[in-house]
Amino acid sequence: MKAQTLHVAGFGFRREATLASLGQALDQLAEQYGAIYQCGAGAIDKLAAARSMLPLVEELGRLRNIEVITVADAELPTVTTLTHSAQSLQARGTGSVAEAVALLAAGPGATLLGPRIISADRQATAALALSEVPEGITE
């Protein structure tokens, strides 16, 4: 059975973040990794957020027509991230919420394309994880 690649963008952000912060982070992520969030190869297939951060990411998903996956906040510390932010470790128990969320949402065996990016206003972060999904299986 042939596998297809699932691209999941995970988000982390401060309370002060706006929809524009997340949108800019997603655009920057897409530009950095050459991904587009429309149909086709290299697309960002899904967005992901911790349950406590869900409403703003759901709004972005509605605007960009991208499905959103929810990750349990309690799962964040179970993931090894590339970034080790002291502030994130203290607040959420993980080195990067965006990286942890992307990996958890993409599923077992997922890998990050690189460390998280930070929005221009420094209020949001985004990371892109990839996983192989057997053809015919949907999440």
Regions found by a protein language model. Give the residues of each.
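Conserved mixed alpha/beta catalytic, RNA-binding, or beta-rich assembly cores of soluble enzyme
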Residues: M1-S52, A129-S131, T138-E139
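Glycine-rich loops and low-complexity Gly/Arg-rich segments
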Residues: Y33-Y37, A72-A74, G93-S96, I137-E139
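Short linear motifs at secondary-structure transitions and domain/linker junctions
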Residues: G42-K46, Q87-Q90, A100-A105
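Long, charge-dense
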Residues: A48-A50, L54-V97
